[in-house]
Amino acid sequence: MIAPSPKSSEEEGQKDEEVLQGEQGDFNDNDTEPENLGHRPLLMDSEDEEEEEKRSSDSDYEQAKAKYSDMSPVYRDKSGSGPTQDINTILLTSAQLSSDVGVETPKQEFDIFGAVPFFAVCAQQPQQEKNEKSLPQHRFPATGLQQEEFDVFTKAPFSKKVNVQECHAVGPETHPKSIDIFDFTPFQPFLTSTSKSESNEDLFGLVPFEEIMGSQQQKVKQRSLQKLSSRQRRTKQDMSKSNGKRHHGTPTSKKKTLKPTYRTPERARRHKKVGRRVSQTSNEFVTISDSKENIGAAVTDGNDRGNVLQLEESLLDPFGAKPFHPPDLSWHPLHQGLNDIRADHNTVLPKQPRQNSLHGSFHSADVLTMDDFGAMPFTELVVQSITLQQSQQSQPVELDPFGAAPFPSKQ
């Protein structure tokens, strides 16, 4: 992109001339190059800028080298070398110099940019101070003071306030008042000082849980002992007050109020229904045992009523309840059409054989054996019906093996 020449700008308007003159700036119009009278191409500009940057970087490098030449003998020996100095040569020269002087460890190493490593600012001061006696003094003019001023970025010194004596503590010998590079005391000395305190606090200033719980348990024990002693005093006072009047206590005495209140309704129930209840704990069976009179009222015969009541009393289970009686089959709606034998028995007594139109009527309750629920086994029903019906009927009847209603056989 080449800017237009002043010849072409004369042909255009006056405004364009002003703009172009402002763009051209202070460049020389008497350039000998015919193609670009007003400007140079962009590629040439970039090359010139690169050369200027190289010069500026070289000057910066020389300044940094001049600064570090006071500290390190490496740069004093290699002051004539250019910016393309190799790292290996620096390390080799430093190792050679240290071996010549008789020092075991090499001096501070500088990276490509001429900066000191971050960890080497304060840690290597003790070694250098030991080596200052063996090395000539004119090579190290005030090394300790200058090393404090230089950090990684060769600007704001972090460790300005650190004394040379305190910087020894970063090495193997550490004492509780040592300060690190950032002017802070290490975390460990505070821990050792606080852990020896009486309260045994942890890192965060908190007392351990066991100590708190132990103190609380001791307090609880003391309180319980105090309560026990107060109770013993009360009982002794009560005994001394009620001495001699023990058996006839007035209704305002304390012993009646101390009794629990939940026992009184149970006692009242026990005194009211003591004749009718067998069990003291079950309240459900009171109504069942109270309904004895209702069962007996259904019986019409006066003589049978006494027998039935005696049977019921003897057959009560341990809970005071009677055996379960299923509803009579003759009263069931399914068997309403089979009521031909119901005329013999008007009422059904409990614990007596049930009227059954299928198997006939059973007259004696002693012959039949009932189970716990007032029902008879199937085999006994069949056998008893056969024997009873044979005694009633004059002619012999053949019965089917399944105990069905006896029909006269067709002989």
Curated annotation (Swiss-Prot):
It comes from the Eukaryota. Residues 1-87, 215-280, 392-411 are annotated as: Disordered. Residues 8-18, 53-68 have a biased composition (Basic and acidic residues). Keywords: Coiled coil. It comes from Homo sapiens. The keyword Cytoplasm does not apply. The keyword Metal-binding does not apply. InterPro entries: AP2_assoc_SerThr_kinase, BMP2K_C. The lineage of its organism: Eukaryota, Metazoa, Chordata, Craniata, Vertebrata. Residues 220-234, 243-258 have a biased composition (Basic residues). This is Putative BMP-2-inducible kinase-like protein. Residues 47-71 form a coiled coil.
